[in-house]
Regions:
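Hydrophobic transmembrane alpha-helices that form the core helical bundles
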Residues: 42, 55, 61, 65-154, ...
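Membrane-interface loop-to-helix entry segments
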Residues: 17, 21, 147-212, 245, ...
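A generic transmembrane alpha-helix motif of multi-pass inner-membrane proteins
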Residues: 31, 39, 55, 179-182, ...
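Membrane-interface "cap" regions at the ends of multi-pass membrane proteins
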Residues: 1-54, 63-66, 205-212, 508-528
Length: 528
């Protein structure tokens, strides 16, 4: 009887992905090179007394342990397409799940309009500056250049996933090489350079462009701290957070991986800890190469109010610091560019995939129009969903370039996801073993016997995860240092939640008019 309430008897998807495909989806959503760039720039422009190394270690001890457990166990217990919507609608309530995922989809669109512009700035702009191509750098950073490049990457991402998950998997495996390799080259350049050599390289550029030498640059940035404190170190969660949380994208492939009980947990662990290791090596390398207040001045110049008198033609962010450290090496310049191309390409691709799978899951539960459940028998792909998502991405890139551009867009989009995706799903992870309505799902879970001192491991993981999430939300949206920058965007968050809840009640009422009681579907898993 229950299966009659679902819109289809089967999802139409095919289980053909392996653990490396799952890992790749999580890692590419983290976007290692971009995460390292934003980690330093956002954290230290807002909280200049923050110690990145300590912030990463604290994050690793909480979210680094909790995130893979929560997402790996929930997805392995409920291996269906649709991500956190499936878990939260069963464990908590479908209205909460739809409000949360509605907001996540808005955040994904916003995030990826921003990410699509990265092909122009910083990737190609910095590369052109490093190569001395002033005209090229100016064009890729112009509104026209940003829009054209952003549109190209959206279309390429769409074509990479719309007709075949096999082609997506092949492309992703290839792109993992420059995505990880570029970060390793960047970090190696920093670790191989002494402070004396870096200062010499920096001062040579200052002389060439009549800019500020090393000491003058620090002085011009103002009275920046020379050591760290606990407040700003916890505040640095606003920058390092992306190392720990974007493994969640793997959940959207849950209905398409082989051996989900093992594949999903292993993929989640790798997708969190590879970025953590890269982040730790970068942070410790930077403190080895430059003074604490120089790093703060670099963040202020590239992500903050700027530094008066700095006239070199490139932003002094962590990417440029690595290139300068290498003696302006072409290998480092190409490594940065290729790493950005890889993560931008795959992140846009995965974002389109996520939205298509989310709408499919809604449709299966009769929480959306019938075409949400249309899956091509030939390609095993929800082509209509993916096409609509691609069009919204393309239109949104234009809107973003013209009106919405902000260097803190990632923090704003990430904040929306922290509440709607990570906080809500963390709560679901804590409650999963104890909710009567999903007792049958928990009893069938391969992780039901995993306990420490009698407490289910998923509950422990959820608590650790929530500790990090709550701290990050406070320092990114409540603390006086950041709230004036990010708080004004909370109205978008509230509107998205309201729209998702209204959406749920509309479709529930519509199904009731057709004589279908959809409430019975939310105590069990949707069709495979």
């Amino acid at each position: 009887m229950t299966e009659l309430t679902y819109a289809r008897k089967a999802s139409g998807l095919v289980r053909g992905l392996d653990m490396w495909d799952a890992f790749g989806a999580g890692l590419m959503t983290c976007q290692p090179i971009a995460t390292l760039w934003l980690m330093v720039g956002i954290a230290l422009s807002l909280f200049p007394s923050g110690n990145l190394t300590i912030a990463i270690i604290l994050g690793a001890l909480t979210a680094g342990l909790g995130a893979p457990l929560v997402w790996g166990i929930l997805s392995g217990s409920m291996p269906r397409a649709g991500g956190e919507y499936v878990y939260n609608s069963r464990i908590l309530h479908p209205a909460i799940a739809l409000g949360a995922q509605f907001t996540n989809i808005i955040a994904i669109f916003y995030w990826n309009w921003f990410i699509a512009t990265w092909l122009g700035v910083p990737a190609l702009q910095l590369f052109g500056q490093y190569m001395g191509w002033a005209g090229f750098s100016d064009w890729v950073a112009s509104k026209g250049g940003l829009f054209i490049l952003g549109l190209i990457i959206v279309v390429i991402g769409y074509l990479s996933v719309v007709f075949s998950m096999k082609s997506y998997a092949i492309i992703q495996k290839i792109m993992l090489i420059p995505a990880i390799g570029g970060c390793i080259v960047l970090i190696a350049a920093i670790w191989m350079t002494s402070k004396g050599d870096f200062v010499s390289h920096w001062n040579a550029i200052a002389t060439q462009y009549h800019s500020l030498d090393y000491n003058a640059f620090i002085k011009a940035a103002g009275n920046l701290p020379t050591t760290w404190n606990w407040h700003d170190t916890l505040g640095a969660f606003s920058g390092v957070y992306a190392l720990f949380v974007y493994n969640y994208a793997i959940a959207y492939l849950s209905g398409e991986v082989k051996r989900p009980d093992k594949t999903l947990l292993a993929g989640n662990i790798l997708a969190v800890w590879v970025p953590v290791v890269l982040g730790l090596f970068l942070a410790t390398g930077l403190y080895h190469m430059v003074d604490f207040n120089f790093l703060g001045a670099s963040a202020q110049a590239s992500f903050g109010a700027g530094v008066k008198g700095y006239t070199a033609p490139y932003s002094p962010d962590v990417l440029t610091l690595s290139w300068i450290a290498s003696g302006k090496s072409g290998v480092v310049a190409w490594s940065i560019l290729l790493a950005f191309i890889a993560v931008i390409w795959l992140e846009i691709t995965i974002a389109i995939l996520i939205i298509g799978r989310a709408w499919l899951a809604w449709g299966l539960d009769r929480m959306g129009p019938k075409w949400f459940t249309d899956v091509s028998p030939r390609h095993a792909s929800p082509i209509k969903n993916l096409t609509v998502a691609m069009v919204i991405f393309a239109v949104g890139v234009a809107a973003y370039v013209l009106w919405l551009t902000s260097s803190l867009s990632g923090l704003i989009g990430g904040g929306m996801q922290f509440i709607s995706v990570f906080l809500i799903t963390g709560i679901a992870g804590v409650l999963f073993p104890y909710r009567k309505k999903v007792r049958g799902i928990w009893e069938a879970s391969p992780y039901r016997t995993w306990k420490i001192a009698g407490i289910p491991v998923v509950t422990i993981g959820g608590v650790l995860y929530l500790i990090f999430i709550i701290a990050m939300l406070y320092f990114s949206f409540v603390d006086p240092t950041s709230r004036d920058v990010t708080g004004k965007n909370l109205f978008v968050f509230a509107a998205a939640w309201a729209a998702g809840i209204v959406w749920y009640f509309f479709w529930r009422a519509r199904s009731a008019k057709q004589g279908i009681d959809i409430s019975v579907t939310f105590g069990e898993l949707p069709p495979e």
